[in-house]
């Protein structure tokens, strides 16, 4: 590599390639100032640096210059490429961390660390409703105050159990969803708009709310749960128990198996704003509807007050960042519409092996 006009340019090139040693010749500034200039020209390099040292040789009598033999230690957890580092000038969009339901780890160089923390808090609901099994963010930050005013933030994720085990349980849940639909439908072929009710009816009748898991979360919201099962689709679909997260993911698994667009929503209940509550948005015939399977679980029947509801009705009991989710304006396919359809056509489905328990629950509660 040839000598660059400016020593900081040669240093930048060496650091991009993660070279452990570099020689800087004919320098008129201290090695610290050269590092400062390099990090000012390419702020992303701060994410690579662990430490540095330099031996020097003084040259010249009238105009003193230095030759530096620089050694550089790089962070073991540094990104593999400089292109994987994001620079934040105050306008970083935290929602880019979550793409297609998969959380993306990120190394961020920023002068706005306080804003970063605020932005991560603001999208916590999106994280919880997009990524099954994620408990929260894990952020590690460091600075080199003598070299840069920037902070390096490495953003990763806490999972409620090891990711390999999580994937295993998710695979079992997907298989269980197939089995559940067979037990509900038999050989009958029902319209898509009926299936959200059948999934809702199944979950609310066959599963129980795990009060112990809820009490643990209520007492210590920041710690990892001792029992992750109620937080996953695996809980309701296989062990038939869960809290709101588990029921929402289970409902989504059933909708995925039925090829119906469905997502989770993280917010809270108006009656208890301290704890996250998770439910679903389901899309039927181009319109979104809210479905809260947890709310439907009652000892004396199936409660349909939060089944296939628009935003305007859901606001009475639930709170969520509405701007972060699709607007639910659907009105047509509410419970009354589905009930009328099943009253007229249900016997045909029963003749094909459909399970009467889920098509016609003994007790419906408004």
Q: Which positions does each model-derived feature cover?
A:
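Intrinsically disordered, low-complexity N-terminal segments that are enriched in acidic
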Residues: 1-156
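Low-complexity, Gly/Ser/Thr/Pro-rich intrinsically disordered linker/tail segments
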Residues: 33, 75-90, 302-366
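Short, charged/polar, Gly/Pro-enriched secondary-structure boundary elements
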Residues: 78-81, 163-165, 286-290
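Solvent-exposed residues in well-ordered beta-strands and their adjoining turns
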Residues: 158-160, 283
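Secondary-structure boundary elements
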Residues: 161-236, 363
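Alpha-helix capping and helix-loop boundary segments enriched in small/acidic/polar residues
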Residues: 168, 238-242, 271
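A short, highly charged nucleic-acid-interacting micro-segment common to nuclease
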Residues: 233-247
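Hydrophobic/aromatic-rich core segments of domains that either
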Residues: 245-315
């Amino acid at each position: 590599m040839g000598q660059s006009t400016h020593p900081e340019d040669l240093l930048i090139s060496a650091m991009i390639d993660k070279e452990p040693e570099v020689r800087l010749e004919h320098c008129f500034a201290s090695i610290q100032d050269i590092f400062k200039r390099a990090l000012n020209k390419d702020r992303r390099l701060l994410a690579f640096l662990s430490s540095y040292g330099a031996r020097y040789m003084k040259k010249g009598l009238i105009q003193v210059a230095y030759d530096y033999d620089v050694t550089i230690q790089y962070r073991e957890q540094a990104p593999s490429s400089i292109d994987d580092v994001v620079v934040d000038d105050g306008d970083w969009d935290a929602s880019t961390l979550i793409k297609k339901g998969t959380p993306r780890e990120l190394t961020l160089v920023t002068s706005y660390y306080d804003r970063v923390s605020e932005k991560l808090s603001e999208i916590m609901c999106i994280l919880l409703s997009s990524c099954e099994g994620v408990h929260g963010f894990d952020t590690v930050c460091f600075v080199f105050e003598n070299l840069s005013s920037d902070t390096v933030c490495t953003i990763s994720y806490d999972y409620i159990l090891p990711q390999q085990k999580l994937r295993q349980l998710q695979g079992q849940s997907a298989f269980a969803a197939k089995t559940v639909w067979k037990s509900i439908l038999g050989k009958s072929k029902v319209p898509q708009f009926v299936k959200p009710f059948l999934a809702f009816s199944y979950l609310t009748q066959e599963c129980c709310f795990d009060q112990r898991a809820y009490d643990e979360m209520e007492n210590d919201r920041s710690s990892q749960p001792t029992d992750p099962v109620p937080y996953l689709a695996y809980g309701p679909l296989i062990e038939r128990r869960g809290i709101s997260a588990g029921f929402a993911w289970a409902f989504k698994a059933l909708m995925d198996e039925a090829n119906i667009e469905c997502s989770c929503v993280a917010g809270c209940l108006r009656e208890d704003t301290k704890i996250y509550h998770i439910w679903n948005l389901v899309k039927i015939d181009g319109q979104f509807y809210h479905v809260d399977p947890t709310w439907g679980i009652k000892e004396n029947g199936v409660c349909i007050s939060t089944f296939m509801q628009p935003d305007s009705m859901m606001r009475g009991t639930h709170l969520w960042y509405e701007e972060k989710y699709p607007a639910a304006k659907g009105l047509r396919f509410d419970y009354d519409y589905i009930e009328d359809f099943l009253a007229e056509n249900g016997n045909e489905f029963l003749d094909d092996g459909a399970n009467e328990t889920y098509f016609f629950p003994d007790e419906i509660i408004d």
